[in-house]
Amino acid sequence: MIMSKDDLIQFTGTVLELLPNATFRVKLENDHVIIAHTAGRMRKNRIRILLGDKVMVEMTPYDLTKGRVIHRH
């Protein structure tokens, strides 16, 4: 079964820690802490994410411990 974009869940969070390979520890609004990597569009356009930035994270309902950073506020 192919997952559509409608199946993804979006949360707003704050970057707590910068990890290697464009990976971040993000604290979501609901106080959960997840690991998130940078989306390809952000990597391609060289958008920098720094400690304390507010970000929009996209997650799959199947694994709520990992996500993808899709927007920086």
Curated annotation (Swiss-Prot):
Looking at the record, the residues that make up the S1-like domain are 1-73
The organism encoding this protein is: Rickettsia massiliae (strain Mtu5)
The record's keywords, sorted A to Z, are: Cytoplasm, Initiation factor, Protein biosynthesis, RNA-binding, rRNA-binding
Q: What does this protein do?
A: One of the essential components for the initiation of protein synthesis. Stabilizes the binding of IF-2 and IF-3 on the 30S subunit to which N-formylmethionyl-tRNA(fMet) subsequently binds. Helps modulate mRNA selection, yielding the 30S pre-initiation complex (PIC). Upon addition of the 50S ribosomal subunit IF-1, IF-2 and IF-3 are released leaving the mature 70S translation initiation complex.
Q: Which family is it part of?
A: Belongs to the IF-1 family.
What's the protein called, per UniProt?
Answer: Translation initiation factor IF-1
This entry carries the following GO cellular component terms, namely: cytosol
The residues forming a coiled coil are none
NCBIfam families in the record, alphabetically?
infA
Q: How does it assemble?
A: Component of the 30S ribosomal translation pre-initiation complex which assembles on the 30S ribosome in the order IF-2 and IF-3, IF-1 and N-formylmethionyl-tRNA(fMet); mRNA recruitment can occur at any time during PIC assembly.
Is rRNA-binding among the key words of this record? yes
The answer, when asked if rRNA-binding is one of the entry's keywords, is: yes
